[in-house]
Amino acid sequence: MGIEILLSTLALATSDPTRSSEVVGYSSQGRAIRVHRLGDPASPKKVLVVGCIHGNESAGIAVTRYLIRSTPPTGFDLWVINVVNPDGRRLHVRQNGRGVDLNRNFGSEWIPIGARWDPEYSGPSPWSEPETRIVRRLVKRIQPQITIWYHQPQKLVRAWGQSSHAARKYARYARMAFRLIRWPHGTAPNWQNHRFPGTSSFVVELAPGSLPEHRVARHAYAVTKLARVLMVSARV
């Protein structure tokens, strides 16, 4: 299986330098987590988009799949993960396969919360879960200026601190409400924003249910529009 993954990755990279794909790790139950890379790999402008971290909040996958299928962008380096919590998606639960809320397991202001399978159980320790460690490695590797996390179901874009400027722009491009809300303990955006000053990691809360096609396209537009603003402005 490992050889097949390697060969498929090499084939993608060889056939089209603007598209590649690789498995960056495995979930707690052994499912592959894959990242797709689109656009200009030589560009210093990096954007990361994650479609699903809570397994029962999967509407964002439609946006990430749309981005992957679209013509690769020019002028920036786009990294896309459809699902960082494949076990939770398979089980249709918020938590990962070990009953941990991955978005309370990051090592930024982490505190012990709840018990296994509680909605916001933060795990036995920060970074206890393979999925959060995979994200940590990837973010350290590519150091994206913008990271967008899709959630549900609040129908708004939320951010705090240094990420609020970029998040407001996304909200405008996507025609959504924006709210300044402090990050809970142990979240992915809070970790990145503290670990990499000057970057912008924020959350897009989609509506309940699946996204209609025109909204999928609108969110994909918001991603690329925000990235292009990044190309011409040091402060997004």
Predicted regions and their residues:
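Active-site/substrate-binding loop(s) of hydrolase catalytic cores
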Residues: 27-28, 43-50, 57-181, 188, ...
